[in-house]
Amino acid sequence: MAKKQSIRSRNFRRSDPAYDLDSSTAIENETKLSVKEKVAKEIANIALRSGGSESNGISKKKKNKKQTSKKAKDKLAAALKAQAREERLDTKISKSLQKQEKLKARKQGDE
């Protein structure tokens, strides 16, 4: 889906003499440029506005926000895994201690 242009950017392009259709210099410039040059210029403008080809149309601010939220989720998941590991270790230790105590009690009871 195409991104809706803001009024501010539209007004900026309208005030630019290169985009001004009423200006005679803009018409002269258009006649001098070939179709390939016009297309290349428009593609360059779009790429500049979108933040480059590597961003795939996602604005830099939005991309950074997604990355930070993803990093936060990863950190939270890692912390939860570590906590679960710790709990399992604690239960193993407590079970082994209980088993040792039972064995000691049996040995004392036998003697």
Curated annotation (Swiss-Prot):
Biological function: Pre-ribosomal factor involved in 60S ribosomal protein subunit export from the nucleus.
Any one Gene Ontology cellular component term annotated for this protein: preribosome, large subunit precursor
Oligomeric form and interacting partners: Associates with the pre-60S ribosomal particle and the nucleopore complex.
Segments of skewed composition (Basic residues): 1-12, 59-73
Source organism of the structure: Schizosaccharomyces pombe (strain 972 / ATCC 24843)
A matching Pfam family: Alb1
Cited InterPro entries: Ribosome_bgen_Alb1
UniProt entry keywords in alphabetical sequence: Cytoplasm, Nucleus, Ribosome biogenesis, Transport
Region (Disordered): 1-25, 47-111
GO biological process, any: ribosomal large subunit export from nucleus
Ranges annotated as biased composition (Basic and acidic residues): 83-111
Family: Belongs to the ECM1 family.
Entry protein name: Shuttling pre-60S factor C23B6.02c
Subcellular localization(s) per the UniProt record: Nucleus, Nucleolus; Nucleus; Cytoplasm
Chain segments annotated as coiled-coil in the UniProt record: none
